[in-house]
Swiss-Prot record:
An example Gene Ontology CC term for this record: cytosolic large ribosomal subunit
One Pfam family here: Ribosomal_L27A
Oligomer and partners: Part of the 50S ribosomal subunit.
Stored NCBIfam families: rplO_bact (TIGR01071)
Organism: Aliivibrio fischeri (strain ATCC 700601 / ES114) (Vibrio fischeri)
TM annotation in the entry: none
This protein's name: Large ribosomal subunit protein uL15
One example GO MF annotation: structural constituent of ribosome
Keywords per UniProt: Ribonucleoprotein, Ribosomal protein, RNA-binding, rRNA-binding
């Protein structure tokens, strides 16, 4: 193998479409844009959601509800993710240290998803009924 013999695999680099280069090319004159109209012009794009002057769907539908700011600082933690935490006491700080949750999270809830094999103590976190049963079945406990 030599540098001057290197070439890309056949068909891996298709030649780009050359538009407006004569009738024989099949893409001459109008260049695949058809005749007249906004889309035939340069810069003739229609913004996303524009419906030709008709009231767009986004504006026809009513505003509804809001995004709770508390949800932005709340996280769900799966049972299977508790295994990533070193030590047997699990609280908000230990979850952050193990990169299970991000540093801006202020509230966390343990949910039943996956399995837990080791006995752990969950401190200061909310826990679902199913997760509580699974933690206690593994020999762990929940403290408020």
């Amino acid at each position: 193998m030599r540098l001057n013999t290197l070439s890309p695999a056949a068909g891996s680099k298709p030649s780009k479409k050359r538009v407006g280069r004569g009738i024989g090319s099949g893409l001459g004159k109008t260049g695949g844009r058809g005749h007249k109209g906004q889309k035939s012009r340069s810069g003739g794009k229609v913004r996303a959601g524009f419906e030709g002057g008709q009231m767009p769907l986004k504006q026809r539908l009513p505003k509804f509800g809001f995004t709770s700011r508390k949800s932005l600082v709340t996280a769900e933690v799966r049972l299977s993710e508790l295994a990533k935490v070193e030590g047997n006491v699990i609280d908000l700080n230990s979850l952050k240290a193990a990169n299970v949750i991000t540093k801006n999270i202020e509230f966390a809830k343990v949910v039943l998803s996956g399995e837990i094999a080791t006995a752990v103590t969950v401190k200061g976190l909310r826990v679902t009924k199913g997760a509580k049963a699974a933690i206690e079945a593994a020999g762990g406990k929940i403290e408020e």
